[in-house]
């Protein structure tokens, strides 16, 4: 898989992830650990809620989005999260949903405090197999520039 650097990007670039199937088991395991509300834990109890069935925690959706974003852009040295300005869950994720993430680069600038790094502003839109938007996120991250990678290489003498 190709590694990306700040230098490879331009405003308007879009990247689409591979799909990921969300299983009931994954949904319940995440909920037990991190968001133990009844509509995430029990199919039967969830049927009596406003959701009319089991749903993923929004935080699980955010974690899936992060995984797919990282796998898709595969930044050399990783992407250092600087913050999320907006996070929305306009629809729910249910067991059996197949999730994909489309990332758009909305702004780029060199880091003023960290030479060799750039700051990217991105918009992630997470959808299910029906094209319904289940999450939107506007965030910023710091990623390495190619020159930084060259400066860090060592030679064996």
Describe the predicted segments one by one:
Residues 1-11, 89, 93-157:
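HotDog/MaoC-like acyl-thioester-processing domains
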Residues 85-87:
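Conserved interaction-surface patches within small, structured recognition/assembly domains
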Residues 1-83, 146-157:
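Hot-dog-fold acyl-thioester-processing enzymes
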